[in-house]
UniProtKB/Swiss-Prot annotation:
Pfam families: AIRS_C, FGAR-AT_linker, FGAR-AT_N, FGAR-AT_PurM_N-like, GATase_5. This is Phosphoribosylformylglycinamidine synthase. In the N-terminal section; belongs to the FGAMS family. Monomer. PANTHER family: PHOSPHORIBOSYLFORMYLGLYCINAMIDINE SYNTHASE. It comes from Escherichia coli (strain UTI89 / UPEC).
């Protein structure tokens, strides 16, 4: 039976206004829109009155419910029947944890009530199209129609393909029907294999074969034999990549054989809790570094949010499934798309060439995709610290003559680093009889065909199959699985995981055969033991679906009870679905139908399928030199600063958490003005050291339209000039991931790919001492469609994205582009040696040209010398600022440095050649360094020692003020105010934020950027930052216990424990499941801290599901009430913990006036480094800090304080319960965005109780307790940041 329960309003006023404006633009007479959430409960038994009241209370979250009966035509948008939304999975979990076992499933829709003039059926279809994502949602016209969401179908049996009766044609038909993308020789191979077995294949076997042997999974092109211009080539592409490892194996521990590569890290204190006692402590051991970069291009073109989200999620799983289990740490993300054509902000180079119906626009991808990727990383608890963004779409005369080149099939890049224990780097052995386990969520009928689908050019497969390729994301589930993996590797030698792989393309049909085959075993499986939420799925759908957030593991049979215990504690679902066999055979039994859908020798599936040969021709580009007529430097500057590749990326940065883990030493945002221009990302290796890891990206795809090899060399060169900004040491410490994107089969591109791989793998990397131990290829970068009567194709340029990773010697020595105005000199190191080529530059692109000669690596020895010289200068602390030259050239390098330093530039380019345009806009490799004037001679001497004397040019100095002036020989070449340039550079991000977020907030942020008087972030402390007020109490040896409380989805508990640990506490890991099961109580604790993250993915209001699981459980409710009423206890709630505790007001004495915390005014997750002021309040944790003003990490989507009315706010203020407020850079309490990131009245962001014993706050002091983890800080701070005082105050209070 289904019950319907009304929910809160679903859209804010500005969202409704945006919809109305869109309808108006489409000439649809829509007058009013009201939207509210509607909940549907599928019940297995009726609820009594108390249970019904409990369910109603559970589903009461967010803004107050509307009291009126909605008017207008109903359009009900729900998830597509046959799918289960991530919201449903998490909300159902909460209902069960609150004791409502009668609820089979909760689901949520949005009911739109629309009052409109007379609309035709076709116009109503336009209206419904605007209101839902056809790939993931459906529209009903009555609330009762939602019954279809819970319809169950009978299981269907496996289907056989009549090969023996119909011969080869049966396989050809199945290939088309199932979208298998099998090549002719593979069809021959299967015909031969099954004829020899003497039986017909089942559909599931063919599907499994297609997934396991797709280009996506088998990399046939990279392993192929090559004939170019009639000449047999000596090596495959993959062999040339492996050559880098053969020449430079230094520091690599694992390459080419696992889900990620591993290199040597540093010996540090890894901080985690003991399995038996729950007590956190440091464990001195090597933290080796793993690295992986994936792409998720096809799903992102179809449905950008889930496409990018599952792209990030899959890459995170690759890291966790490395060796015998590892810890993902920090992420990077990247996008290449066609032109944005932002409405009202179209640029002169952006022509509309049309697109296929089945894919979305570049603007849609960049509106939704980055949000999906960021949301997954945020909810999982991984900071996203690095990225790139390129737009390209043009009709150009390239290798194949004049044609359309661009990214209708986008690149969505997801990568990152993690850490792994030394003894877990290599996978273990799978014993015969080992249990084969699926860890993670249930099978669902989604993402079918992803591996094969992404191996086809968009437009080759059936549109319905594209629907089937869409996936769905549940990062909170992945976090639970990762917590299990963490518990396993933390056990050291007792780790129950023998072998682990993630489940990705092809689902279990790819993952399980890979697992047993890699372990040298076969496997026998039971289909019906696989967890499934949809009983009507066929065997093919159960075995081959790509439901995300799953891992496959081999666990020794005697270790299963331990593994079961770990999973139950973390509430991570798992199922034992088979066991390893001696015989290399794969069998899958179906208990329901008592048959064998799969019964195959492993070598049929994974054996020597036919090897591909690529017989291709070389084509050379004949570009025309750049036509200069009508190009002025002033116009060029504005155009180039508007090009999204160059323009400010704030809209892509502040949506992503950049402080979680407490180990982020360098994020994108630089300096007191928080400008997104960092050269590279840097993390600390642990919470107790200055060793670290660095990541940087290099990418110059448009150059490939002129010169394939140069484009590849420049990608490596740019990654190197980016990562050089931190202290690494020997270049052999740097390892690269190479991600290759090409339109295989397009004239000239295959030979170009070979040329590019050879340039990097056989020549450049070996010469530099660089290794490429990991990478990926995507070989179908083309879209085809019909535009009117014309057949069109959009082919991406050959695109190599290089991600560089390295161990860092001292994270404190990372140099940023932030200029200083002390007596200084700016030096350009021009590795282009005066070539100043303008082919395929940003300048060429904004004038709709390609040019003829591009930049290149001009001298490999000098590139190596450059890296070594910069490393020497970093170690000697001779550099004040550093920024590489890249897209937009020297002009953009100097501008970005000036933006970061909020200063002027007085530059002279006389020594850079007579062609001023080329001097300013060429994109040859190089960098601008800022040094003290007194150090200039010594710095130039170091550069000369490294063979760079002929590359160094003095180009002026940074000056105070707002003028950006470039001269040559006394003549002004360009002059503008820095503020004007800053505003031009920011306009793309402003327009994107206006479209995507609350336009009022976007306008406020843009306005703030034009304020030259803004002093930037600054610090005023009312206490001595270096005084340790806890020291006398620590000296007694007593370590009071703090319960570090977490719920499923919480992700900030480790850094919280570390902060309390440093202040003299014993931090104990306490999971809500421990309290609910009675394994642990709160009576033995002096302090309770509820940590940040996304409990239950924030589905029933941030922190509200967590709070209700306490309030609706009598024993646990009493446990909390007793703790809060006990004198001499302290409690702290941060972020999600703050939201949760604000919902426990009925249990906490003196908290009656506390507000609720609701959706930010921007309607967006906000990750900022915000200035706050400590106000006079009873808070015991903030004693002695009153009046201090200092920055703090902020990361939340629902942090806005909501009070009932003005009287409530006045009472909260007059009682003095406000503990922290947001202030602007002038020190004034503010409600202006983004200084106030959530729109809270009077800047309120922390409150306390009347006794001061319980304090709750939205910002994260635990993420910045170390100076090094602050995005910016005064140079005189030592090891401890000012927020360490909170934790020491806690220790002092307990005496």
């Amino acid at each position: 039976m289904m019950e319907i329960l009304r929910g809160s309003p679903a859209l804010s006023a500005f969202r409704i206004n945006k919809l109305l404006a869109r309808f108006q633009a489409a000439r649809l007479l829509v007058h009013t829109i009201y939207a509210e959430y509607v909940h549907f409960a599928d019940l297995n038994a009726p609820l009594n009155d108390d249970e019904h009241a409990q369910l109603e209370r559970l589903l009461k979250y967010g803004p107050a419910l509307a009291s009126h009966a909605p008017q207008g035509k109903l359009l009900l948008v729900t998830p597509r029947p046959g799918t289960i939304s991530p919201w449903s999975s998490k909300a159902t979990d909460i209902a069960h944890n609150c004791g409502l076992q009668q609820v089979n499933r909760l689901e949520r829709g949005v009911a739109y009530y629309i009052e409109a003039g007379t609309l035709t059926n076709e116009q109503w279809q336009q209206v419904t199209a605007e209101l839902h994502d056809r790939m993931m949602e459906t529209v009903f016209f009555a609330l009762d129609d939602a019954e279809q969401l819970f319809a169950h179908h009978q299981p269907t049996p496996v289907t056989s393909v009549d090969l023996l009766g119909q011969g080869r044609q049966a396989l050809i038909d199945a290939n088309l029907r199932l979208g298998l993308a099998l090549a002719e020789d593979e069809i021959d191979y299967l015909q031969d294999a099954f004829t020899r077995l003497g039986r017909n294949p089942n559909d599931i076997e063919l599907y499994m074969f297609a997934q396991a042997n797709s280009e996506h999974c088998r990399h046939k092109i990279f392993n192929a034999d090559w004939v170019i211009d009639g000449e047999q080539q000596p090596k495959s592409l993959f062999k040339m990549i492996k050559n880098t490892f053969e020449t430079t194996p230094d520091h690599v521990l694992s390459a080419y054989k696992d889900n990620a590569a591993v290199m040597e890290g540093s010996e540090v204190g890894r901080y985690f809790a003991d399995h038996e006692t729950g007590r956190y402590d440091f464990h001195q051991e090597p933290a080796h570094i793993l690295m992986k970069v994936e792409t998720h291009n096809h799903p992102t073109a179809i449905s950008p949010w889930p496409g990018a989200a599952t792209g990030s999620g899959g890459e995170i799983r690759d890291e966790g499934a490395t060796g015998r289990g590892a810890k993902p740490k920090a992420g990077l993300v990247g996008f290449s798309v066609s032109n944005l054509r932002i409405p009202g902000f179209e640029q002169p180079w952006e022509e509309d060439f049309g697109k296929p119906e089945r894919i979305v626009t570049a603007l849609d991808i960049m509106t939704e995709g980055p949000l999906g990727g960021a949301a997954f990383n945020n909810e999982f608890g991984r900071p996203a610290l690095n990225g790139y963004f390129r737009t390209y779409e043009e009709k150009v005369n390239s290798h194949n003559g004049e044609e359309l080149r661009g990214y209708h099939k986008p690149i969505m890049l997801a990568g990152g680093i993690g850490n792994i224990r030394a003894d877990h780097v290599q996978k273990g052995e799978i014993n015969v009889g080992a249990k084969l386990v699926v860890l993670g969520g249930p099978a669902m009928n989604i993402g079918l065909g992803g591996g094969a689908a992404s191996s086809m050019a968009s437009g080759q497969s059936d549109a319905d199959l594209d629907f089937a390729s869409v996936q769905r994301d549940n990062p909170e589930m992945e976090r639970r699985c990762q917590e299990v993996i963490d518990r396993c590797w933390q056990l050291g030698d007792a780790n129950p995981i023998l072998f682990i792989h993630d489940v990705g393309a092809g689902g279990l049909s790819n993952a399980m055969p890979e697992l047993v085959s890699d372990g040298g075993r076969g496997g026998k499986f039971e289909l019906r033991d696989i967890l499934s939420d949809e009983p009507g799925m066929s065997p093919l759908e159960i075995w081959c679906n790509e439901s995300q957030e799953r891992y496959v593991l081999a666990v020794a049979a005697d270790q299963l009870p331990l593994f079961d215990e770990l999973c139950k504690r973390e509430r991570a679902p798992y199922a034992v679905i088979g066991e390893a066999t001696e015989e290399l055979h794969l069998s899958l039994h179906d208990r329901h139908f008592d048959n064998q859908p799969i019964d195959l020798p492993l070598d049929v599936l994974l054996g020597k399928t036919p090897k591909m040969t690529r017989d291709v021709q070389t084509l050379k580009a004949k570009g025309d030199a750049l036509a200069r007529e009508g190009i002025t430097i002033a116009d060029a500057v504005k155009r180039v600063l508007h090009l999204p590749t160059v323009a400010e990326k704030t809209f892509l940065v502040t949506i992503g958490d950049r402080s979680v883990t407490g180990m982020v030493a360098r994020d994108q945002m630089v300096g007191p003005w928080q400008v997104p221009v960092a050269n590279c990302a840097v993390t600390t290796a642990s919470l107790d050291s200055y060793y670290g890891e660095a990541m940087a990206i290099g990418e110059r795809a448009p150059v490939a339209l002129l010169d394939f090899a140069a484009s590849a060399r420049l990608a490596v060169g740019e990654a190197l000039t980016n990562i050089a900004a931190t202290q690494i040491g020997d270049i052999k410490r740097i390892k690269l991931s190479a991600n290759w994107m090409a339109a295989a089969g397009h004239p000239g591109e295959d030979a170009g790919l070979y040329e590019a791989v050879k340039a990097v793998g056989e020549e450049l990397c070996p010469a530099l001492g660089l290794t490429i131990p990991v990478g990926k290829d995507s070989m179908s970068m083309k879209t085809r469609w019909q535009e009117g009567n014309e057949e069109r194709e959009m082919t991406s340029p050959l695109s190599l994205v290089i991600s560089a990773f390295a161990r860092v010697e001292d994270v404190r020595h990372t140099i940023t582009p932030q200029l200083s105005t002390e007596d200084n000199a700016l030096l350009l190191i021009d590795l282009g040696k005066g070539n100043n080529a303008l082919g395929a530059t940003a300048l060429a692109q904004v004038y709709r040209q390609l040019g003829d000669k591009p930049a290149d690596v001009r001298d490999v020895a000098q590139l190596k010398g450059f890296y070594d010289a910069i490393q020497a200068l970093v170690a000697q602390r001779k550099l004040l600022a550093y920024h590489d030259r890249s897209d937009g050239g020297l002009l953009v390098t100097l501008a970005e440095m000036a933006f970061a330093g909020h200063c002027g530039i007085d530059a002279d380019i006389a020594t850079l050649g007579d062609d001023r345009l080329a001097a300013l806009f060429n994109e040859e490799l190089g960098a601008v360094i800022q040094v003290r004037a007194a150090d200039r001679e010594a710095v130039e001497a170091v550069l000369a020692q490294h063979g760079l004397a002929d590359c160094v040019h003095y180009v002026g100095q940074a000056v105070s003020g707002d003028r950006f002036v470039i001269t040559a020989n006394g003549q002004t070449v360009f002059s503008e105010s820095r503020t004007t340039l800053r505003v031009w550079w920011a306009e793309t991000t402003w327009q994107m934020q206006r479209l995507r977020d609350n336009p009022e907030c976007a306008d406020q942020e843009h306005q703030a950027k034009s304020n030259d008087a803004d002093p930037g972030l600054n610090v005023k402390l009312s206490f001595d930052i270096n005084e340790d007020v806890a020291a006398p109490f620590i000296a007694t040896g007593a370590r009071p216990k703090v319960a570090v409380l977490r719920e499923q989805g919480v992700n900030s508990h480790v850094e919280m424990a570390a902060a309390f640990h440093r202040a003299g506490f014993d931090a104990i890991d306490v999971h809500m499941s421990d309290l609910l099961a009675g394994r642990t109580g709160l009576e033995g604790f002096h302090v309770l801290v509820a940590c940040g993250g996304f409990s239950y993915g924030d589905v029933l209001g941030a922190g509200e599901g967590w709070a209700k699981s306490i309030l609706f459980n009598d024993r646990v409710r009493d446990e909390f009430a007793t703790f809060f009423h006990r004198p001499q206890t302290l409690a702290l709630g941060v972020c999600n913990g703050c939201q949760m505790m604000s919902n426990l007001r009925e249990l906490i004495p003196g908290s009656e006036l506390w507000p609720r915390f609701v959706r930010n005014t921007s309607d967006r997750f906000e990750a900022r480094f915000s200035l706050v002021e400590v106000t006079q309040s009873p808070s015991l944790l903030l004693q002695g800090m009153v009046g201090s003003q200092m920055p703090i990490a902020v990361s939340h989507g629902e942090g806005r304080v909501e009070v009932r009315d003005a009287a409530h706010l006045a009472a909260l203020e007059s009682k003095g319960l406000v503990a922290l407020r947001y202030v602007d850079n002038f020190g004034k309490v503010t409600e202006t965005y983004p200084a106030n990131p959530n729109g809270s009245p009077n800047g309120i962001t922390a409150v306390t109780t009347e006794s001061g014993r319980v304090t709750i706050m939205m910002p994260h002091p635990e993420r910045v307790f170390r100076t090094v983890s602050n995005s910016w800080h005064p140079e005189n701070w030592g090891e401890d940041g000012p927020w360490m005082r909170i934790f020491r105050n806690a220790r002092k209070q307990l005496g």
